[in-house]
C-alpha cells in the first residue's frame, strides 16, 4: 500500500524506518579490478538506530530487499517504510512486500530532503567517521569490508546521541519492547522471495 502524506518527526519506535543508499568506498578486488561500492541502510526514525545495513556492488531492488528482510527478521515490522522515488524503491514489488508483512510505504516527494534527513545525515556521519578512517589497501573482498562496516555500526548504535537526551540509539530503540511486532521466520521467508509473486 502506498501513502501520500507529509511526514513529520515521528517520536515512536517502529513508526517509521527510513531507507536509502549511498556510494561507499571503491574496492580493489584480488583480480586487480576496482569496483564502486554501495551502502544500503535502514534507520529507525525515533531512535536513530541502524536496523539494517549492508554493502553491495550494485544498488538495486534485490539488494534492498535483502537488507529489509534481515532487519524485519531481527527487529520486527515498522508501520511505515520511508523511501525516495528511485527505481530501487518505487515499484509494485515494494508495495506488495510491505502489504505482505503488514506495513506500508511512503515515497518522499522530489526535492524534499528533509523527509529523509536522518538517514542522509547518518550517511554523512558514516563517511566522515568510517570511510575517512579506512585504508582500502587492506580490503579486497566485500566480506571483509562488510565486517568493518558492521563493527562501526555497532559502535555508532551504542554511542550517546546528542538528540536522545543522553541515551544511545540502542538504548532508545530497546526502551519500549511492547512496540515490537515480530513475524515468525516462516512468514518472513514466505513474504520476501525473489522475485515477489502475487
Language-model features: where?
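A generic secondary-structure signal for well-formed alpha-helical elements
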Residues: 72-75, 105, 126, 130-134, ...
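Residues immediately flanking
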Residues: 21, 45, 85
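Mobile-element integrase/transposase regions
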Residues: 1-41, 49-50, 61-67, 74-79, ...
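A conserved active-site cap/scaffold subdomain adjacent to cofactor or substrate pockets
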Residues: 141-158, 162
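A short acidic/small-residue loop/turn micro-motif
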Residues: 56-60
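C-terminal, beta-rich DNA-binding module of retroviral/retroelements integrases
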Residues: 158-198
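Short small-residue beta-strand/loop micro-motif enriched in glycine and branched aliphatics
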Residues: 48-52, 106-108
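RNase H-like two-metal-ion nuclease catalytic core shared by retroviral integrases
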Residues: 81-85, 89-100, 105-131, 140-146
Amino acid at each position: 500500500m502506498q501513502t501520500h502524506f507529509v511526514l513529520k518527526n515521528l517520536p515512536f519506535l517502529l513508526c517509521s524506518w527510513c531507507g536509502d543508499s549511498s556510494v561507499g568506498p571503491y574496492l580493489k578486488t584480488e583480480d586487480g579490478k576496482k569496483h564502486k561500492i554501495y551502502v544500503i541502510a535502514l534507520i529507525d526514525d525515533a531512535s536513530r538506530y541502524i536496523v539494517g545495513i549492508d554493502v553491495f556492488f550494485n544498488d538495486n531492488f534485490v539488494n534492498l530487499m535483502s537488507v529489509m528482510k534481515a532487519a524485519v527478521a531481527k527487529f520486527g515490522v515498522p508501520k511505515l517504510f520511508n523511501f525516495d522515488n528511485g527505481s530501487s524503491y518505487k515499484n509494485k514489488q515494494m508495495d506488495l512486500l510491505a502489504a505482505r508483512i503488514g506495513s506500508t510505504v511512503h515515497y518522499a516527494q522530489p526535492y524534499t530532503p528533509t523527509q529523509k534527513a536522518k538517514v542522509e545525515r547518518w550517511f554523512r556521519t558514516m563517511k566522515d567517521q568510517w570511510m575517512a578512517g579506512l585504508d582500502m589497501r587492506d580490503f579486497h573482498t566485500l566480506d571483509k569490508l562488510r565486517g568493518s562496516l558492521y563493527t562501526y555500526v555497532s559502535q555508532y548504535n551504542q554511542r550517546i546521541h546528542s538528540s536522545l537526551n543522553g541515551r544511545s540509539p540502542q538504548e532508545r530503540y530497546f526502551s519500549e519492547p511492547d512496540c515490537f511486532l515480530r513475524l515468525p521466520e516462516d512468514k518472513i521467508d514466505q513474504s520476501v522471495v525473489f522475485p515477489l509473486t502475487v
